[in-house]
């Protein structure tokens, strides 16, 4: 099974969402369920899927600290929809730690994830936050 990076990001989002609800879940077993729901045997886990999920989990506190300043003063990470927070964590991780993903691609992919897993308000919110990030990086 060969997945595009877009499809891998979707699987990473699903894995991180599930792990947010159940942090003690077995990552490998979760990957197998996401990649092979028919359970016809184990499939190879794409390296980029492991990179995203493991990286976001290992750097979660750091990513959250980077996201917080981009929220308005009356908002905290706890108030964000979990879908939006996880999408932002993925985008911030790619922006900071993945050298071969241009900022424009990371932002666009995050917006595509909100289209798939959230609503229009979330899409606008995520787009606004990441727009500020890219603008700050350019300065």
Q: Across the structure, where does each feature detected by a protein language model lie?
A:
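N-terminal interaction/assembly modules
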Residues: 1-116, 122-123, 127-139
